[in-house]
Amino acid sequence: MRLHLLLLLALCGAGTTAAELSYSLRGNWSICNGNGSLELPGAVPGCVHSALFQQGLIQDSYYRFNDLNYRWVSLDNWTYSKEFKIPFEISKWQKVNLILEGVDTVSKILFNEVTIGETDNMFNRYSFDITNVVRDVNSIELRFQSAVLYAAQQSKAHTRYQVPPDCPPLVQKGECHVNFVRKEQCSFSWDWGPSFPTQGIWKDVRIEAYNICHLNYFTFSPIYDKSAQEWNLEIESTFDVVSSKPVGGQVIVAIPKLQTQQTYSIELQPGKRIVELFVNISKNITVETWWPHGHGNQTGYNMTVLFELDGGLNIEKSAKVYFRTVELIEEPIKGSPGLSFYFKINGFPIFLKGSNWIPADSFQDRVTSELLRLLLQSVVDANMNTLRVWGGGIYEQDEFYELCDELGIMVWQDFMFACALYPTDQGFLDSVTAEVAYQIKRLKSHPSIIIWSGNNENEEALMMNWYHISFTDRPIYIKDYVTLYVKNIRELVLAGDKSRPFITSSPTNGAETVAEAWVSQNPNSNYFGDVHFYDYISDCWNWKVFPKARFASEYGYQSWPSFSTLEKVSSTEDWSFNSKFSLHRQHHEGGNKQMLYQAGLHFKLPQSTDPLRTFKDTIYLTQVMQAQCVKTETEFYRRSRSEIVDQQGHTMGALYWQLNDIWQAPSWASLEYGGKWKMLHYFAQNFFAPLLPVGFENENTFYIYGVSDLHSDYSMTLSVRVHTWSSLEPVCSRVTERFVMKGGEAVCLYEEPVSELLRRCGNCTRESCVVSFYLSADHELLSPTNYHFLSSPKEAVGLCKAQITAIISQQGDIFVFDLETSAVAPFVWLDVGSIPGRFSDNGFLMTEKTRTILFYPWEPTSKNELEQSFHVTSLTDIY
């Protein structure tokens, strides 16, 4: 067991002083292509694709087949340039730097026609000394090289041996050799996304001028004294001292609400200097801890750090201080070989519930603050507490992590390496070293981040031999793997952040991987670490096909996004499941067939003679299939948290693949591009509920487990009802004796042979009846109402076509949908087209004549607009 104790401080800002000035170069720049035939203005931060679109030179890059039509943009070499006048007297400053927070990706930088440096890493922050070349009036140029061409050159130059994979599968329509360039890996395509290898200045760029000294980095390391039961804090400040003499002064650290104020004397010698301060927080002060969503508050404390230095130089930093501990528990389990794999936050075992995050857009300048908040609010609204930031995308922007801190979303943070082997030549390692060191400094202050992971699936790719490497050559690649992730990235993490755990890969066997010299024979073992699991052939309603693993960090099924989302980027001839557009948009080999196959196991496929109706019905059915499959699998993981069966179990995490979409296409996402909730996301709101009854069958016996994520025990009852498909009145019901549901456990609450249940309920057969159940106390509902199908819906007897009507009214900012049905209706789907917002529930089984559902609009709308856009579908409508 490894103990990681954490006190975190999120930087909020800094005061400017008389001894330093900053001048932003954000805004309008000039852009031209390689041969100078195309010149246009472009915004910074931004990229070439966005600039071309904003000038009307290209359409929306996501429209129809434009990912192929605009491939030329990524293959050209573009130049960004700007002329500007600095609004202060430059000669008064001892040091002037050009700061680039993010350059995408390969460029040569000229300042006043002097080459000052190069960039080759999208994830690094670059600082160039321009003291000797800067003037009052200046010019700057970034001459980009196509990342696609650069990657090909780097691969060609690596002559000693191949570093696979060379190219993505043809179905992805992507570019090759992405593993040779430190750029967003999915920008060369993925099985859910397009190929748009962008070029541009994608983050802030500015001039910094200073005298005496400058504070470059300001980071924090926590120390918790268990014996004294008190918090301490190490503050690490990195200075660039340009004074020729030592700089003395004092530092005042203040956290008012913790009644903490301490003063330190410091002296800085010329050059790059690090100051470490040790702050003690009295154990007599009650410190409120930061908790994940659903487990407590996200309490933070304001802190100021004031440096009062010689020469009248004052530098002030403000920060938000969060207190929490994180432990990754890997220890023996009675009755099972291997080790546990779960997290304790503030000493309490937490079941991680959530999903995997991918970039929200191929063009990061389109990812607004509003979109980030919308997507992350949807995470907690669905009762999730965790996101895994997947290693094939980007280290997200600061605001993403700030929102996760605020909302209580734990972050599993991958380093940006995915589904590939990587070179380990010195130039590549040097670039990675700078990247990782910078990202650790930037992100370590966030309480939301609970673990670093070295890569996505690269250990599995190597050991399961995805790339058909010969047995004799394998040691070369194992050596490279250990060099990159263990000897470099791991060492950087251990040196830069001792406050949270690190694992080399996902999936991995954790401590067992370490014992096996960093590469396990089976990284997907059910007895160690985490697993990734995908199976599109086995029946997803059969829980026995799922791994009873310690932690499921990836699993899922595809579906199509709603018609209103696809309509924006398609034309009328595209609106069929077998159209050229539908095949083009599917980047997962065989994906469309897999969806229909899985749906056909339990549902009748759409039978309309109208092609457009069939397309819409098929979209609906893929979302039903996806939601039901992921529900079955997630509920299996949740009910496995407290038990060992056949030596397997104690599952303590379920992160389905994937949360969000990068464009409008079929994928594993539960949120469509732009944020609209698929049926799966509504299901997640229920299957991730803090209290949940889970029903399943084993050997013709029906079981209901109670699952609790709560910290306390609660007294309650379980109600079980059986309906026939042909009646809105239950044919029988049963309420258990009152029992105590223990916090943080999953236990069996109900057990009955299916034959006995059917006999007890009169005329029921498997095909004619359905079971629903819920937890309550004193007539108060404590859980969602869950259900269990006794047979496939395609075999249902008595299921009638339901006539469902809705009366819409408004209450403040919320709209009320009063529904009425003529018959039992499975998978009732309420849709208001492109009107942004979400319902309180959706995709539900309607077994009562009336039901009230709320609609929460994300933008102003009206009752009339909703009535015009509203459409309701249930399962029998597609037959």
UniProtKB/Swiss-Prot annotation:
This is Beta-mannosidase. The lineage of its organism: Eukaryota, Metazoa, Chordata, Craniata, Vertebrata. The gene is MANBA. The keyword ATP-binding does not apply. Belongs to the glycosyl hydrolase 2 family. Optimum pH is 4.5-5. It is found in: Lysosome. Pathway: Glycan metabolism; N-glycan degradation. Keywords: Disulfide bond, Glycoprotein, Glycosidase, Hydrolase, Lysosome, Signal. Changing residue 638 to H: No effect on enzyme activity (in vitro). Monomer.
